[in-house]
Amino acid sequence: LSSLVLQRLGADITASDHHPLAGEFLLRNSTLNQLPPIHYACCDWALDYPELGRFNLIIGSDLLYERDHPALLAGFIDRHTLADAQVLIVDPRRGHAASFTRAMAQVGYMQSADLRNGHVCADVPFTGRILNYCRHSA
């Protein structure tokens, strides 16, 4: 959803996922929303994708649901971000955020905020949090 919203706002988007059908779903949703196709890459966090490039902003949602995900995701982010970058991760509190924060610190990121307030819609409170990490070149 965030890719579609950002595409609508005119951002330069590259979406990725490791699910084999995610690219098809993204293309279908882009078409339904009368948007041009969004650049998409199916990625395994353990592998390197030099052709993917480096980004100044990475946004992810509900990514930390397995014990090995914090280290894998932090490594993937490190390989695909510029020296100055921001990372926003929506975390529904599955228990791996602290490990992820430690792994991000090892690759030079500081957690600048833990945004907790908000509502999914008018009557539904958001019980998760948005983890915000920044890295700046020296």
Predicted regions span which residues?
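S-adenosylmethionine-dependent methyltransferases
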Residues: 1-138
